[in-house]
Amino acid sequence: LNLKKIVKIVHLEIRKKMNIFLLQNKNKKIVILDIPLLLENKINKKKDILIFVQSKKSDILKKLLKRKSYNPNLLRKFRNIQLPLDYKKKKSQFIIKNNFTKKSVKRSIKKILNSIL
C-alpha cells in the first residue's frame, strides 16, 4: 500500500468525522478545523475561510526531531504529496506567522477572529 492510498483511506474517515462534527456544531458562529492535506484532498468548500500557518523550515524540523515517532522517510513521502506552500498561501484568506510562541499566535488568532466576526 503506498502513501497516497493510505491518505485516501484515512481522509474518508476524516470526512465522516468532520461532517459529524459540523452537524453537531451547526449552530455555532464559527467552527475551526485543523485538517492535514485539506486542499490536497479537496475537503474544503468555497465558503470556508482558510488560514495558512507559516513557520520556518528549521523551526519545524527542530519540533519534528523532538518527536519519538519522527521518521525522515515518511516526512519526505508526505512532502511529495503536498501541494506547494505558495499555492496554499494564495488559497488562504489569512496567514499566521508561527514562531512557536503562544503569545504571538494567540494575538494573530484574535485579529483574525475580530475581522471574521
State where each predicted segment sits.
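Phosphate-binding beta-loop-alpha motif at adenosine-nucleotide cofactor sites
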Residues: K90-S104
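Amphipathic alpha-helical segments that mediate coupling or scaffolding at interfaces
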Residues: I9, K63-L64, F78
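ATP-dependent small-molecule kinase phosphotransfer cores
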Residues: L1-N27
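Residue-level signal for inorganic ion chemistry
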Residues: I6, I32, L75, I96, ...
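ATP-dependent NMP and nucleoside kinases share a basic, alpha-helical "lid"
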Residues: K17-R67
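Short, flexible turn/loop "capping" segments at secondary-structure junctions
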Residues: I43, Y87-K89
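C-terminal alpha-helix
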Residues: K111-I116
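C-terminal non-catalytic interaction appendages of large macromolecular assemblies
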Residues: K68-Y70, F78-L85, F100
